[in-house]
Design a protein with these regions (language model features):
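Hydrophobic and amphipathic membrane-targeting/association helices
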Residues: 1-223
Length: 223
């Protein structure tokens, strides 16, 4: 196809691409606005050995994974639910449901454990992440009381968390819908052009398809 053919297609069928893209973008925007917003709050906890000893520091790094396993349990979630109820913020969910809304990960190079809590209310997500970390601090202090001071592992809580919207990402979804719609519209246009590629409408079509020069054209009859 020549460049002029592409311009002809855009001129005659470009509206299809635009319409499909707009419809897809509007649909994605509407679907995003209809979703219940979910907020995420992240809390960081730093785990520090009591003495600057290479052996204890290495052990602490290994313990980080164990701490994550201990915190990522239904029993731990129940403790957080109890704390929420005591603070006047009871949750209508089971420990399993709360546990599924919390992701705990360790970063051994920084001696940090990160707690990500998701909830339909931003402030509640903050409280869950904060209390989850506080429970860990309390448990770690109790464990420290069982060992010598030089063998203790201290816990330092980060700043009180601040929530952010986790989903829906309305802007991203709308843009993705528009791009998908434009691609779909382009496929529709390509299909229409392929279907009609065998039709001959003008002398130029004859020359392009058959490679023959048109010597004359039979005029249409008028009645």
């Amino acid at each position: 196809m020549e460049l002029s053919d592409y311009f002809r297609i855009l001129r005659t069928r470009g509206w299809i691409i635009v319409v499909v893209a707009v419809v897809a973008a509007v649909s994605a925007f509407g679907a995003s606005r209809a979703q219940r917003p979910i907020y995420k709050s992240s809390m960081q906890v730093t785990v520090l050995p009591a003495r600057n000893d290479m052996g204890l520091a290495q052990t602490t790094k290994q313990l980080l994974r164990a701490y994550v396993t201990i915190m990522d349990t239904k029993n731990w979630a129940q403790q957080v639910l109890d704390r929420l109820a005591q603070d006047g913020h009871p949750q209508d969910m089971t420990p399993e449901q709360l546990k599924n809304n919390v992701i705990i990960a360790s970063y051994e190079d920084k001696n940090v454990i990160q707690i990500d809590a998701k909830d339909g209310a931003g402030e509640q997500a903050n409280r869950i992440a904060w209390l989850w970390a506080q429970e860990f601090e309390t448990w770690r202090n109790l464990e420290n009381g069982k060992v010598r001071k030089e063998d203790q592992v201290d816990v330092k809580l980060g700043d009180y968390p601040t929530y952010a919207k986790f989903r829906p990402q309305t802007t991203i979804n709308t843009a993705a819908g528009g791009i998908f719609g434009a691609l779909l519209g382009a496929l529709i246009v390509a299909a229409l052009e392929w279907i009609e590629s065998g039709l001959v409408r003008t002398p130029a079509d004859v020359e392009r398809n058959l490679g023959l020069a048109v010597l004359g054209v039979i005029p249409t009859s008028e009645r």
